[in-house]
Structure formats: structure tokens, C-alpha cells
Amino acid sequence: MQDERPVDQLTEAEAAAELAHLAEAIAAADTAYHTHDAPRISDADYDALKRRNRAIEERFPALRRSDSPSERVGGALAEGFAKVRHEVRMLSLENAFELAEVEEWIERIRRFLGHVGDLRFTAEPKIDGLSLSLRYEKGRLVQAATRGDGETGENVTENARTIGDLPTELTGAPDLLEVRGEVYMRHADFAALNERQEATGQRLFANPRNAAAGSLRQLDPAVTASRPLHFFAYAWGAHSEPLADTQQGAIARLSALGFATNPLTRLCTGPDELLAHYADIERQRASLGYDIDGVVYKVDDLALQRRLGFRASTPRWAIAHKFAAELAWTQLEGIDIQVGRTGALSPVARLKPVTVGGVVVANATLHNEDYIAGRDSKGQEIRGGKDIRVGDWVQVYRAGDVIPKVAEVDLSRRPEGAEPYRFPDTCPDCGSAAIREPGDSVRRCTGGLICPAQQVERLKHFVSRAAFDIEGLGARQVEALWRDGWIRQPADIFELPNRYRDGLQRLENREGWGRKSAENLLAAIEARRRIALHRLIFALGIRHVGETTATLLATHYGSWAAFEAAMTRAEVGTGSEWQDLLSIDGVGAVLATSLVTTFHQEAERAAIDALAAHLTVEDAEMRAPVESPIAGKIVVFTGTLEKMSRNEAKARAEALGAKVSGSVSARTDLVVAGPGAGSKAKQAAALGVETIGEDAWLRLIGDA
């Protein structure tokens, strides 16, 4: 994030473009982590994206998107499980990586509450597993659900019943009680499971979290029962009567009901005690026998928790103090160039293998040519301007199951004669020119569909889980079928059963294929001839169109016929179809140009039409609008509010769908003015913006 411009220097157009990019990046990270159990970026990088998004939204409230990451929790649901709507949302936590961020969080709480006395907090290890909500009625477990997107999860009740330390009956519990916690796998059990997987020729799990998530989300409960899962309880959802008056008391009550709770939970006062317990837990981390990735702090007084309430996706009364990324030094042995589906040339460091956080690392991303040269995409120095050369000793870090990164270079150990790296200006796969367009941070191959690397990567994207998700057709199978000339574009996949009347026999004779796997693949292809509109749009692999944008486009146009017709008629920069495209919240000129250009390129359009001929595309589900008198409006508070704090008023407005701004402009819909209102009230009057008092505000939102 070192190439960011300060938020106060952004123009409105720049802010809108960056919010669109951030929405895509965060949505992709959410899906990778929550839906596919395969995180792609570190927690620190993820949190930096979220902070940047929040800062831009606060500076430009009118640009807040309908798909804002600030209002989203988790990822999309996997297919195969019944959906469960959470009576009380399962939210994520705000993250902190430095003590200063924890101190700032405490200060925000004090300001929100107007509280000057001592505040007490609980501090507990943050378990690196899968969140689970357990619903008990009359003491009996009746439902277990994953977090999903926070609003709706997956019904895994039968699987949860197989977890040994998870009680299925409670004595002395409220008539209704939802207990929430984390499913995890111990290190020793994880090692034994992977040994069994290897012995039976099955896929190995990358880490205990992935193993726990994959084991709980099995369609066959017998498989889950064979896996050694455990559960720590740490929270609750819906309940018919309170568990206690404090967080600590509620955890003690859960323990008395028979739930495993973490023995390292402590009651602390102030940041010094919190940090001391954080350090104590970090010292014990390696010997705990299960993975943790930080310490969670919560306001202990439940009455204060209720007053503090929630932001769109996180509670104000809790924060996760994450552990720093793990680091190691090793030597850079070479730099390889990989070509992605949009032609991006990505440099990858080939490293002398080194262990980082218990995982052997032999490759790491180098991002782009600027990063190698020691500068960001705007020409500003990073790493003190030190470039990266083959032979250098570099510092590598990773946090979670993500692509490792090179953080630093030790110039004192640079070999004599090490030459500056010259980034290629031609594609290593097809030889086409590789150009870097103004404003782009990467160099791209211009070969398009003639580039073998782009063909393969587009096909991999097409069959990925968020796209067509064809069972039995993963990256390795795509590479093999492409190499043998069976498939070149997505339509070829659907022509396999018809084009090769003896296709089943030919598949069966291939290495790694048997009769059953061949039958299953052809059946899976047939099953995917019917596809949801948003999945198809995402699967096309159009540059700048991620999962979130694909869903927005699908919702806007409703059907494939309407979408295809609009893209056909649209002209870049002009016409009603172009303006209609730009009117979609989250679609800017760059993204719109990419869409329209793709549909107007002859080869690209031919490939799209050939694919569509094989498909039945389901129309999009239309979302119901938020029902509130202030939904979608920009509200400004000024002066002194007497019946609630300014922060509480802001939180209430945002919960009802409004956007709260700190300044009055022509876009402002409503100003709420209390005693002492000054320049903002005058500015509102000059602009003709409606201004009301606090009592009228409370009546408007139904809180009078």
C-alpha cells in the first residue's frame, strides 16, 4: 500500500475509481478466505485495504457504494448445503496490528460513551479456524450453521453433531440459546490426517484451518466424523434470557453449560494489561498445540456493549490484535515471469527454500517491475530505493496460507557482479509485445487469445469455483486437455461430449483417468449447461470484472439477453447504453471501457457467442431495497445533540441506510441541527438543504 496518495489529495473521480478497485480486491479476498478456505492475501494487507476503503468513504460519503466492503461480512456461500439465515448477524472483527491502534480503539470507545472512568476488557486468543453458530431450543441442539456472509450461513447440523467436545444437549440453559465459537484442528491431529491423506493418494491440506473448514463442510457427515475436530465457545447470538451481565461472566456460564472455553481468557484494565497478556499469549503460541493468529479484546460490561452497538460489519466493542507476519532471510536464485489471463506479466522470485512459519517457501511474489526496481507505481521510493537482483539475500514474509512476499533486501550481502534486473518487453510465452499503459502498474502481453499462457489461464479462471466450478476439471486437468489440443476456449469444454463420440473411452485411456472419473466429468459438464447470470459474467474473465461487479451487472440487466444486447449497442464514451452502464453503482469509465471493448473485439465476441450457444442462463435475483425514510440519503449532523451522542446518531443513521457526511454540499439531503449549530446550518440554508432539529430527527427514524 506504499503507492497510495493521501485521501485528502484525491479528486472525486480518483476516489470513485479507487473505491471500485478496493471493492473488487476485498470481495475476492473474502471469497478466497470464507468460501474456498484458501486465503490469497495476508491479514495485514487485507486490513490495509479495508482501512483505505473506510478512509475514502469518510472523505467522500456520496461515493459510498451499494456493495461497500464496509457493509459486508465473509464471502459467498458454497453450493451443496441448505441455507440458514442468522437471527442475529455473525459479524467479523476490526483488526489492529500495533499497540497504537489498540489505544486508538479504546479512545474511540471513551469518546463514543463519554466515559472517563476505568474500562475493563476481556482478552482471549483468536483461534484460527471456522466460525460456527449452534442453536439450542429447550436444551437440545437443533441447528448448526457456518458464518457464510454474516447474514446467511450453511446448515452443517449433522456434521457438527460429530464433534466430540460439542454438547448436543444442555442442562440449565435458556429456552433459546445460540452459542458461537470456532471449529479448529490441533497440530498433532492435522499431521496425522495429512499422513492418511498421502497414504491414500488424496489431496493434502495446506494448514490446520483449511483442514478444519474442509472437514466440517463435507456433504457426508461420516467423513466429518472421521476427522478430529474441536470447538471453543466464545460468544452468543439469539437468546431468550441473558447469560450474565459481563463478557467474563457469560463465558463462565458457557463453560458451566459444558462448552470448552479458552483457558487463556483474562480480565484486563487498560492498554498496558492488554499488551502484557498479548505478549504472554504470543510467548505460548508455539506450544499451544493449535493455531492462533492474535488476541481478541472485548469490552467486559455487556450494558456498555449494547450502547456501543455495531458498525455495518463489525462490533464497536471488540477488536482483534493480530500477530505480526513471520519473517525469514534467504537467497534469490532467479526471477520467473508468469503470464495471467489478462496478459499481466507477473514476476515470481525463485528462492533457496526456507522455512517461514512452519512452511517451506521456495517462491514469492515480486508484484511488478516497479517493485523490483525499488519504487512504487508513482515513482516514489520503497525499501529506501533498493532494487532486487538475482543473487540477493532477501527477507520473505507470510501470514496465513497466502503467497509469500519479499519485504526487504540486504545490500551488504549482494554478490559482486549482480546485475540490475531487466524486465522483459515481450511475452515469454508467445513473443508478442508486452506494453505498459499509462496509469497501469503492470506490463501486459498484447497477444490476447493467440497467447498460449492467456488461453490456459482464462480456461482455469472459467472453471474456478466462483465461475463454472465444473467438478473434476481443475487447473491440472485444464492444462492437460489444452496441451493435447482438446480445448482452446470455454465453448470447447461443452463440445467435448458431442465432438468426441468416443470421448468417454478416450478420457478413460488418459493417465490419471478411470471410467468413473471420466463419466463424472462428462456429467458435471452437462450439469453446468445451466448457469446463473452473475457466474457467467464473472467466468468470461473480462479485465476489471470481478465477482462483485459481475453481480452488480447481473442485477442491473436481469438477463443474459438484456446484458448481451446492451454491450452490443454500447459505444465507448457516448450514447444511452454507455450512460446506463456508467449509472451502475461501482462501474466507472475504465471498467465500462473494458466491458464494451471486449464485446466489440471480433475474436472475443466469437468466443462469447460460441459459449452462450451451449448454455441456459438463469435470470438474476433482484434485491429488495432497504425500507427506511432516510435510506440512500446523505445526512449531516451539526451542533450538540442532547438525547444521544453524535457517534450514536451517526451509527443509527447508517444502520437505516443513510450516508453520514461531515460537511454540507449541494448533494446533502438532510441536516440535523442541535443547539450551537454554526456554519453548517448557515451553509445548508444557503443551499436550500432541509434542516430539522433533534426531536424531528428522532420522530423521522421512529425513535421518538
Swiss-Prot record:
Its cofactor is Mg(2+); Mn(2+). It is an enzyme of class 6 (ligase). One of its GO terms (molecular function) is metal ion binding. Keywords: DNA damage, DNA repair, DNA replication, Ligase, Magnesium, Manganese, Metal-binding, NAD, Zinc. SUPFAM superfamilies: BRCT domain, DNA ligase/mRNA capping enzyme, catalytic domain, Nucleic acid-binding proteins, RuvA domain 2-like. GO terms for cellular component: cytosol. CDD domains: BRCT_DNA_ligase_like (cd17748), LIGANc (cd00114). GO terms for biological process: DNA repair; DNA replication. Residues 625-704 form the BRCT domain. It catalyses: NAD(+) + (deoxyribonucleotide)n-3'-hydroxyl + 5'-phospho-(deoxyribonucleotide)m = (deoxyribonucleotide)n+m + AMP + beta-nicotinamide D-nucleotide. Gene3D superfamilies: 5' to 3' exonuclease, C-terminal subdomain, 6.20.10.30, BRCT domain, DNA ligase/mRNA capping enzyme, Helix hairpin bin, Nucleic acid-binding proteins. The active site is at K126 (n6-amp-lysine intermediate). PROSITE patterns: BRCT, DNA_LIGASE_N1, DNA_LIGASE_N2. Zn(2+) binds at C427, C430, C445, C451. Belongs to the NAD-dependent DNA ligase family. LigA subfamily. This is DNA ligase. It comes from Cereibacter sphaeroides (strain ATCC 17025 / ATH 2.4.3) (Rhodobacter sphaeroides).
